[in-house]
Amino acid sequence: MKPQFITLDGIDGAGKSTNLAVIKAWFERRGLPVLFTREPGGTPVGEALREILLNPETKAGLRAETLMMFAARMQHIEEVILPALSDGIHVVSDRFTDATFAYQGGGRGMPSEDIEILEHWVQGGLRPDLTLLLDVPLEVSMARIGQAREKDRFEQEQADFFMRVRGVYLDRAAACPERYAVIDSNRSLDEVRNSIEKVLDGHFGC
């Protein structure tokens, strides 16, 4: 099997941070070479843009926000993702372009056609081989976000914003079931872990 590009995505409060540890443990047990990274971020340029994008004081317009996301992504692809895959290393990214379609597209209203143009220009033919989409009901997402001590620029949005974000995620997953695995993360940690491990076992033929 060629090196796999796997993404972990979902609305805020879906449990990505918790379940990244599950994925890391799965790769460690199997002794597979893997690189974990994140978006926006993963490079010095990407991390600098992340600070701007998540800062509640940032007053960026929708197009500027979207372009910053893709600028960070281009650096990420060129400096991190493609070199790792070329070296035979699997890559797991905490968020990728699905998040742009969901947040800037669904949440903010950026036309999907415009995002697709940037996607093709920045990524070429690069697409994830597998996307683990963590999903929780809107009220669960909002409750978990509400527990955060400090909310970033996106976490400060209202429920209707996250309702649209979640809708885009689920629509994209339904349109391409061969790439997406939707994981109900409104369950116990053990149940969610078992679901993720089952998906990874099936994908890698373990």
From Swiss-Prot:
GO cellular component: cytosol
SUPFAM superfamilies, A to Z: P-loop containing nucleoside triphosphate hydrolases
Gene Ontology molecular function terms on file: ATP binding; dTMP kinase activity
Top EC category: transferase
Any coiled-coil regions, as ranges: none
Pfam families (UniProt xref): Thymidylate_kin
Keyword tags: ATP-binding, Kinase, Nucleotide biosynthesis, Nucleotide-binding, Transferase
Residues holding ATP: G10, I11, D12, G13, A14, G15, K16, S17
EC number: 2.7.4.9
GO BP term, pick one: dUDP biosynthetic process
InterPro entries per UniProt: P-loop_NTPase, Thymidylate_kin-like_dom, Thymidylate_kinase
Family the UniProt entry places it in: Belongs to the thymidylate kinase family.
Protein name (record): Thymidylate kinase
Organism: Neisseria gonorrhoeae (strain ATCC 700825 / FA 1090)
